[in-house]
Amino acid sequence: MSDQVYNSYIQHFNAYEAKALKLIIAEFRKQLRGLKFDNLTFDNAKYVIVLNIDEESLKETIYKVDYTIGKAYGTFIAKQLRKENPIQLKKWRPLPFFNEAFQQFLIQYYAKFGGTLIRSLSETMTAAVVAEISKGTYENETVEQMRDRIYKTVNKRDFYLWQAMRIARTETGFAMNSAKEIAGQTSGVLMQKIWIGRNDGRERSSHVHANGQKVDQDKMFSVGGVKMKYPGDRENGTAKETVNCRCTFGYEAKRDENGGLIFTD
């Protein structure tokens, strides 16, 4: 079961991540081209950059990534659960329950954590530009030379590609797994969750140890001493356990003594 679930997850993940990366690269390009380099000096660089980043535009882009990926994948999972467990199909809650619940989840998530998330992204972008500026201080650049060099550097795709890739991967995992969590919650069927990852040399040791861990649907996984509802759970997890995570989880429906599904309603 775990191999099949993970392979399906990664296939979807790679496709969604590519779409997310395009959106994030376009946003980074727009943000960096909008910086006021004419007013930039060694002393005021950080403040000028922070003040010129359009956090609302950045937030809209990341929300779009989370919503479009989560809605698409969550709908797929909801349909897949019904396909795998066709018994008493009419008792399953209809898909609009998922759509409404996922949208509500994202609205509440961004209301609570959106400011911190976007501020973190803008600070990451600022730090990258400031680090590039500092390179010239050892070469006795004039302010004019520094401005010219920074303008050329930050407008190269390679400058922000790594950051964009990290964000795309993190957001894709968050959107997919949070949507899968909600698809299970709104199904109307009692299930258990199983943490699924790959010990391929790239995975965190804490996630390797979590592989195969099984909990009830309304319970939390214990990963690296942290409680999380699902892989990439930023509400409860730490950056150490969520950034760049490629893990997922699977569902196993609970059954009664006759082998039938157990419905919550």
Name the predicted role of every residue range.
Residues 159-265:
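Acidic, glycine-rich two-metal-ion catalytic cores of nucleic acid-processing enzymes
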Residues 1-158, 252-265:
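N-terminal leader/targeting and assembly helices and adjacent pre-domain segments
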